[in-house]
Structures are given as structure tokens and as C-alpha cells.
Amino acid sequence: DPAPALSAPCSEPCPETCSAPAAETAELAEETSLTTAVMPESPVMADSLTHGQRVAAIAATLFQDLAELHGLDDVWGHRLHLAAQLHDIGFAEGRKGHHKISMRLIEEDLSLNIHEDDRPWVALLARYHRKAWPSRRHARFDALKKSDRKALRKAASLLRIADALDYTHTGVVGNLAVAVKKRKVIIAVQCSGDCSAEMERVIKKGDLFMHVFGRELECVCQGN
């Protein structure tokens, strides 16, 4: 299958049809305020903040381009955006198990400007950005009604792919486009350098996506 055509970079606010993962200045200001509320001043946390912004932009593109496939509404798009921003705040207490720490911080830190209706969902999404899939062996996930479990799995699968596309935290992946085929989803990315680590990671972390949507996942780099 041919790779989908990449969108040109936006030099001004992007229309709805543009797939370039660029955030508006005002949005970045709001997002920075959100994350710095819990992030101590350190190189590690500064990197996590920048990485979170990139992952949020990529996740927004995936959410938009895959809308017909996932069928989630804008409420879930907003939750995904917040979770992408905050998924690595657990690094504030160390790398080991940081996904679970991120969940706890999102749940407990009321300085984060998250609506209380969204907070538990954002926390769960951050928890499932890595390691174990959402599972009914987990009490919090099991307590959800079936439709909510299904929606959370879908959103978590997108977050894991978005995170993988900035695996090296270098911003090597720029614009991307998604094509949905009958048995396959193709993600075409524009890379500014070697993105082999990202390509490999997408397939590894895309296992939940392939399970949830029953489609093979392919990621191709089209260069600059």
C-alpha cells in the first residue's frame, strides 16, 4: 500500500484538515502552566515537559486522523491531550514505575487545572502509557462499565503510539499522516534525522492498538 501524503508544515494556525502536529502559542502557554505546577526545576523534568508537548501534538493528529476508526468524542480527545502532556510527571519521583507515579500525582495534585470529571480518566491514561495493557485484573479498570473500558483502551492505544514516536525525546518526527486500510493502518512520518528507534518502538508499543482495532500497524519514514 502507498504511504499517505504528508501535510505541509503550518506557517499559520492550522485548519481542521491539516495534520501537522503543531501547537498554537496560546495552547503551549496553557500546557506549560499545567505541567510546571508539579514539575521541579531539573533537566530531567524540563525534558519531560518538552517531550509531553510533542507527544500531545502527535496524539492530537492521531486522534483526528483516526476519528472514523476509534469513534471517540472530543471529551476523550481532551483527556488524551492532558494525559499526553502529563504522562511522564512521575519522573519527579524517579524512573522506576513512573507511569503509576504519574497516575497518583494526577489524582492527588489539585493544583493541576483538570476538571474533576476528567481527572480519573487522565490519571488512568497516564498509567497505561507504558507497560501493562488496561486489564480487568486491575481493580480500577475492572470497576469501569464496559463502554468506558472500551474507550479507555482505544485512547491508551493512541497515547502509546504517540509516546513511541518521540521515543528518543529528540523531536526527530515532524509532520505525519495516517491512512486507514481494511486490514492495516499506515502512519507516514517526516523525520529530520535517524528515526529508526522511533519506527521500531511504534511497532512494539502499537501492540495494544493492533489488538483493539484488529488491524496491522505499519510506520514508514519519508525523510525530510
Predicted regions and their residues:
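Low-complexity, glycine/alanine/valine/leucine- and proline-rich hydrophobic stretches
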Residues: L159, L165-C219
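Divalent metal-dependent catalytic cores for phosphoryl transfer on phosphate-bearing substrates
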Residues: V38-M45, H51, A56-V178
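Ordered, soluble secondary-structure elements with a strong preference for glycine-centered loop motifs
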Residues: L49, E93-K96, S196-I203
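C-terminal helical "lid" subdomain and adjoining coupling/linker elements of P-loop NTPases
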Residues: A22-E24
